[in-house]
């Protein structure tokens, strides 16, 4: 589609409407740790901590959708309807397991969080706020359920009827710690902030007055939920070792802080007055003992991020306005410069995904193009290969469609921006080694964007479409324990269409697709894929949900209330193991409006537990059953036991995905294109980049110049193949020193009183230095060659389309001190 500049035409808004802010954010998610991103003009969406947070407000109604249908139907042609049998007595079973709760308040927004895993505990915070001329009046109510939302109890008295600051959300502790922190609003003249803490799954709360005013939500250590850190409004870094009972300021002038492994804290600090003034000159510090001792591990820092086992820093280059990514795998003790193009002030880097084996890195293109290049790393995170050109990633708002399909290893989906400004979806099944278009669903026709009505592709709507306010209520959905299932909105043609999308499903991790539902829907997965539930996205009141017990082939509709509600959100426990779904919305009369939830338990639909005969063997990534390499991805095959579509039974909460791996012989598919090589579109072999032909491949690693001899291939990080093809590849140490990083803490840590000593030493050694230079010039031929080789590699990076430009200081002018979201998203 053409890149929309605003909301799509024809999207009507109901004056009072409903706004859904649906955020499913697991704690410490790497997902997209964006480095250097120029901040959006508006404040970013607030991020709730904890396993999952869902927030709804009374704004903006959804655009109109199809009228809900009753009964049952099959995806595809109407003639196939007779293939779908009606589940016996499902209406009576669901009616007996539908629970309504009406919330007796008129709050304008609702936030919901699960506390713990499989505990059934849900906290709901409702907020009502009226801004007055000078101050604002606010009221909060807190509700608790311990049966997955079937019943709620008002526990506002446990927080002394205090107004809770919704921008901090509900900070839920990791794992099953049962810890909850709510940040309260305090009067302007107070010495510090106030929090309410619970360590028993919100049965009781303790009020604690803070010695500082918090700037950010309390951050739990992933290893010990008693350890907390927070930033103050005065940029102090505060740490608690006893779940917030007592706090200690361990450092001042802090811009951004993050927990690392083993309770390590990384943070940036300014030295010249403010984070804004020092952007690009920040220092990166580390403490391994909660603030007793510190080590400066980097200077000239623009931003930093964590992903997998890698620590990243964006560093200002010497005597330049460009930045380079540096990588450490030992918590910052040593650094190496990533073999990536440098970026200018108006550009950014973004960590799209990172695990223990590799990194997906986006490098923005110069200018306001809205796209860049995806690079994939080696297992050290240092040497990168080009993976995908013209990757859509807008600078305004910072939107990318990059999606990790968690239901099948190695699969990612994203969008590219074509030269005609149309947006197309691409998918990789081998962790970025090769990208291709999504296959056209068999039960769909090509739309008006297709030049050939018989040949087109499926294009997926994700974050970018949502940001442009298209009629797309949800991003793509997949779950690790619902093997192979992917659900997404999309259109079928030559590019993404602005027309009303339909919902598509894949049951094999994205290899094949089928239209599942007509028109936009909200959807969720229950019982590890045993049930899929959907609700139509409509601006009219609704009272119908749809569900499928065969991975979206056949659908039943159920009227959950006789009084339709204005729908605001669909909520289910994270992890896709629950049998319960909650429908949230409100009812409205002439003068009143009330929040209401309906929780539907599907336990009686799947009455029996699944047995061995209910499962069948499925070979993942299978595309050619006659080929001995069929199913080989990243060096091995995986056979799964999957629930038969015809089996109506319950996987249960204890269900564990059963899989049997087997190693494959190595082939071209097990190799990425090496440094200096790329795969043309729809090609399997790697070819040399034109701008590198005739040049020797040399790069700087750990301060030593290395020479690369390659046939164009390097093994994909994490690939398990053995034997078979083994392309020649050799890295040789040239025994020459080079600049492997721009971080040099020792220079920054020099005290001012050491300057005379340094000057004296320099004066005494001046003659020796001059003589040494003359000797080197006369007898050593490698020095000039070394500098030349390094500059050649830099020219290659620039020729690759990401050269350094004169800065317009977009990033700096947009940065503001009161938000850590500007440095890393």
Curated annotation (Swiss-Prot):
It is found in: Golgi apparatus, Golgi stack membrane; Endosome membrane; Endoplasmic reticulum membrane; Nucleus membrane. Its main location: Golgi. This is Sortilin. Keywords: Cell membrane, Cleavage on pair of basic residues, Developmental protein, Differentiation, Disulfide bond, Endocytosis, Endoplasmic reticulum, Endosome, Glycoprotein, Golgi apparatus, Lipoprotein, Lysosome, Membrane, Nucleus, Osteogenesis, Palmitate, Phosphoprotein, Receptor, Repeat, Signal, Transmembrane, Transmembrane helix, Transport. Residues 804-825 are annotated as: Disordered. Residues 32-73 form a propeptide. Functions as a sorting receptor in the Golgi compartment and as a clearance receptor on the cell surface. Required for protein transport from the Golgi apparatus to the lysosomes by a pathway that is independent of the mannose-6-phosphate receptor (M6PR). Lysosomal proteins bind specifically to the receptor in the Golgi apparatus and the resulting receptor-ligand complex is transported to an acidic prelysosomal compartment where the low pH mediates the dissociation of the complex. It comes from Mus musculus (Mouse). A motif (DXXLL motif involved in the interaction with GGA1) lies at residues 820-824. The modification Phosphoserine is found at residues 809, 813, 819. The N-terminal propeptide is cleaved by furin and possibly other homologous proteases. Residues 777-825 are annotated as: Golgi to endosome transport and interactions with GGA1 and GGA2.
């Amino acid at each position: 589609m053409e890149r929309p500049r605003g909301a799509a035409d024809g999207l009507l808004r109901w004056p009072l409407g409903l706004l859904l802010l649906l955020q499913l954010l697991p704690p410490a998610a790497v997902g997209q740790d964006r480095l250097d991103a120029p901040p959006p003009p508006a404040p970013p969406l607030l991020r709730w901590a904890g396993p999952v947070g869902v927030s709804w407000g009374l704004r903006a109604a959804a655009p109109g959708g199809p009228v809900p249908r009753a009964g049952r139907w099959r995806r595809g042609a109407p003639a196939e309807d007779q293939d779908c049998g009606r589940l016996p007595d499902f209406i009576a079973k669901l009616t007996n397991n539908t629970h309504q709760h009406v919330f007796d308040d008129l709050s304008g927004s609702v936030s919901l969080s699960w506390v713990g895993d499989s505990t059934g505990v849900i906290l709901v915070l409702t907020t009502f706020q009226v801004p007055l001329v000078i101050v604002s009046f606010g009221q909060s109510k807190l509700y608790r359920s311990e049966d997955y939302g079937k019943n709620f109890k008002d526990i506002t008295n446990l927080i002394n009827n205090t107004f809770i600051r919704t921008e901090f959300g509900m900070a839920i502790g990791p794992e099953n710690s049962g810890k909850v922190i709510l940040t309260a609003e305090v009067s302007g003249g107070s010495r510090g902030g106030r929090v309410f803490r619970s360590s028993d799954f919100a049965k009781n709360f303790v009020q604690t007055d803070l010695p500082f005013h918090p700037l950010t939500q309390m951050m739990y250590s992933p290893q010990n939920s008693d350890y907390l850190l927070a930033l103050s409004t005065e940029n102090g870094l505060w740490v608690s070792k006893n779940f917030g009972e007592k706090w200690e300021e361990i450092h001042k002038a802090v811009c951004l802080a993050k927990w690392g492994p083993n309770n390590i804290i990384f943070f940036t600090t300014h030295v010249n007055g403010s984070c804004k003034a020092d952007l690009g000159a920040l220092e990166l510090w580390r403490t391994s003992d909660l603030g007793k001792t510190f080590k400066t591990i980097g200077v000239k820092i623009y931003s930093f991020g964590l992903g997998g086992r890698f620590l990243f820093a964006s560093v200002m280059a010497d005597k330049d306005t460009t930045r380079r990514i540096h990588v450490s795998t030992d918590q910052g003790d040593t650094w190496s410069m990533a073999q990536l193009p440098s970026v200018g002030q108006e550009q950014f880097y973004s960590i799209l995904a990172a695990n223990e084996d590799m990194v997906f890195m986006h490098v923005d293109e110069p200018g306001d193009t809205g796209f860049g290049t995806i690079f994939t790393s080696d297992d050290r995170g240092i040497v990168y290969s080009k993976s995908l050109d013209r990757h859509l990633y807008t600078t305004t708002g910072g939107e990318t469609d990059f999606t990790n399909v968690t239901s099948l290893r190695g699969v990612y989906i994203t969008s590219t921006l074509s030269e005609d400004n149309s947006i197309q979806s691409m998918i990789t099944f081998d962790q970025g080694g090769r990208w291709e278009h999504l296959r056209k669903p068999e039960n769909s026709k090509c739309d008006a964007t297709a030049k050939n009505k018989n040949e087109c592709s499926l294009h997926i709507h994700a974050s970018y479409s949502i940001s442009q306010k298209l009629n797309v209520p949800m991003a793509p959905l997949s779950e690790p324990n619902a093997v192979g299932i992917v659900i997404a909105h999309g259109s079928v043609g030559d590019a993404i269409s602005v027309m009303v999308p339909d919902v598509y499903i894949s049951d094999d991790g994205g290899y094949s697709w089928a239209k599942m539902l007509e028109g936009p829907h909200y959807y969720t997965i229950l019982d590890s894929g045993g049930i899929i539930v959907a609700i139509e996205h409509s601006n009219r009141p609704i009272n119908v949900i749809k569900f499928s017990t065969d991975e979206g082939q056949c659908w039943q509709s159920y009227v959950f209330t006789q009084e339709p509600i204005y729908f605001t959100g669909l909520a289910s426990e994270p992890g896709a193991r629950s049998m319960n779904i909650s429908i949230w919305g409100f009812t409205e009369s002439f003068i009143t409006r009330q929040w209401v939830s309906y929780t539907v338990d599907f336990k009686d639909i799947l009455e029996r537990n699944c047995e061995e005969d209910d499962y069948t063997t499925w070979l993942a990534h299978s595309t050619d059953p006659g080929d001995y390499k069929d199913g080989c991805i990243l060096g091995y095959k995986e056979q799964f036991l999957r629930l038969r579509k015809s089996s109506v039974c319950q996987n249960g909460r204890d269900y564990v995905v059963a899989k049997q791996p087997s190693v494959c012989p190595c082939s071209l598919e097990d190799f990425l294109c090496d440094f200096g090589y790329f795969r043309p579109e729809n090609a399997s072999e790697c070819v040399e980049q034109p701008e590198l032909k005739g040049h020797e491949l040399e790069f700087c690693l750990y301060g030593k110049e290395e020479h690369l001899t390659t046939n164009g291939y390097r093994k994909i990080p994490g690939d398990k193949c053995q034997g078979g093809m083994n392309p020649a590849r050799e890295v040789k140490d040239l025994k020459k020193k080079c600049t492997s990083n721009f971080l040099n803490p020792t220079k920054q840590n020099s005290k001012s009183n050491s300057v005379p000593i340094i000057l004296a030493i320099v004066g005494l050694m001046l003659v020796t230095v001059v003589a040494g230079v003359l000797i080197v010039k006369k007898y050593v031929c490698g020095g000039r060659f070394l500098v030349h080789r390094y500059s050649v590699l830099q020219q290659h990076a620039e020729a690759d389309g990401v050269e350094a430009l004169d800065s317009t200081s977009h990033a700096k002018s947009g940065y503001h001190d009161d938000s850590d979201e500007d440095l890393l998203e």
